[in-house]
Amino acid sequence: MFGLNKASSTPAGGLFGQASGASTGNANTGFSFGGTQTGQNTGPSTGGLFGAKPAGSTGGLGASFGQQQQQSQTNAFGGSATTGGGLFGNKPNNTANTGGGLFGANSNSNSGSLFGSNNAQTSRGLFGNNNTNNINNSSSGMNNASAGLFGSKPAGGTSLFGNTSTSSAPAQNQGMFGAKPAGTSLFGNNAGNTTTGGGLFGSKPTGATSLFGSSNNNNNNNNSNNIMSASGGLFGNQQQQLQQQPQMQCALQNLSQLPITPMTRISELPPQIRQEIEQLDQYIQKQVQISHHLKADTIDHDELIDSIPRDVAYLLKSESATSQYLKQDLKKISSFKSLIDEDLLDTQTFSVLLQQLLTPGSKISSNDLDKFFQKKIHLYEKKLEDYCRILSDIETAVNGIDTDLFGAPNNPNSTAITADLGSSEAENLLQLKTGLAAIVSTVIEEFTLFMDIAERIAVLHQKTKTLASLSI
């Protein structure tokens, strides 16, 4: 049964419809899990349990679970093939006709499996998705591509939920959540291959992980292939040691076992918890100090905020004054430019006239000379009139000050005005003039005294220097 050779000449039907028979020239290899029967049978073969139709010579007793056999048969659901398909859709290396899947998916493979998987061609998943990639089956030595439960397109073998693994290694067992190990656990942990599997939520760990995705970098050597393993955790988290999760669980258990009540004192707590509470208290005190510091600076900040409108008003006023000054400067610059242009034109005219005068035999037009000098005469007349007006204004101001200070007894107009005024007003005016005259005379005398004192101080300074030089 488990690999024993049979020598009978009459082949019997396999458990699932495989044809078996004795060989006259070669010994059969017997019943095995994946062994290939290469012997030739000459006797007739009988039908299988599920109606398989053996035809022709077969190599020997086929495997019970879909191992490769060199015989022609049909599958349980009407697929016509020259080679038999396994129970779960493993495909031998023989040419077969197209068979339909369980849910009607069309396949171009050689034979159809129980769930409609197509071998050596484009295969469809449970819900009709196409798979076009090939991997090597380690049990039957053939190329096939299997689809995930939800139709994901893997590059190699896929998991129950269709996660894609891109390894080019031989096909391996898949974890329930899409991890691709050589030998996988319930949650997709790798046992001994180099394929990195994703976690439940798509995280990529760097090593073997625990139930909640704790990743470690420890290398586990498998006795069969000695390949580094890597798999994803449930939540995709990473850790450097495999023992961290048990340590966290132990810590939580220890905390839950502590007899902590609302009446427990801090001194009665464990050192680690007491240290955490002290650090938290220090942090709170630090934040309180910062709040007090900010509260102390609130007045200054409010004053600065209140000063912003005043600063803005001052800047606006300064900007307006600066704009006016710039406009005035622009006007003056424009006037300077016009004067410079006029002087330049006059200079050019004078240069032409001078060149004509210096050139012998040239005739000079009197009109040009007359025009030039007439223009200059009018300009100088305007300037003289301006000077005379300014001088007359100065003279009037000086005479008024002199009259107010010292009076004008020889002036008949002042006498008439004084006669018209009353006696009290005349006395007040006289006192005012006398007071102003006294102030002026006092200032003059003070100036004279200051000059005299300065002269005497200079003389004393000179004598002091002379005495100092003699004493040395």
Curated annotation (Swiss-Prot):
Positions of FG repeats: 2-3, 33-34, 65-66, 77-78
The keyword Kinase is annotated on this UniProt entry: no
Single GO MF descriptor: nuclear localization sequence binding
Domain description: Contains FG repeats. FG repeats are interaction sites for karyopherins (importins, exportins) and form probably an affinity gradient, guiding the transport proteins unidirectionally with their cargo through the NPC. FG repeat regions are highly flexible and lack ordered secondary structure. The overall conservation of FG repeats regarding exact sequence, spacing, and repeat unit length is limited.
Start-end of each GLFG repeat: 14-17, 48-51, 86-89, 101-104, 125-128, 148-151, 175-178, 199-202, 233-236
Name of this chain's protein: Nucleoporin NUP49/NSP49
The protein's assembly and partners: Component of the nuclear pore complex (NPC). NPC constitutes the exclusive means of nucleocytoplasmic transport. NPCs allow the passive diffusion of ions and small molecules and the active, nuclear transport receptor-mediated bidirectional transport of macromolecules such as proteins, RNAs, ribonucleoparticles (RNPs), and ribosomal subunits across the nuclear envelope. Due to its 8-fold rotational symmetry, all subunits are present with 8 copies or multiples thereof. NUP49 is part of the NUP57 subcomplex (NIC96, NSP1, NUP49, NUP57) interacting with NUP57.
Species of origin: Saccharomyces cerevisiae (strain ATCC 204508 / S288c)
GO (cellular component) term, any one: nuclear membrane
Single GO BP term: tRNA export from nucleus
Misc note: Present with 4760 molecules/cell in log phase SD medium.
Low complexity bias spans: 64-80, 214-226
Keyword terms: Coiled coil, Membrane, mRNA transport, Nuclear pore complex, Nucleus, Protein transport, Repeat, Translocation, Transport
Cell compartment(s), UniProt: Nucleus, Nuclear pore complex; Nucleus membrane
Family membership: Belongs to the nucleoporin GLFG family.
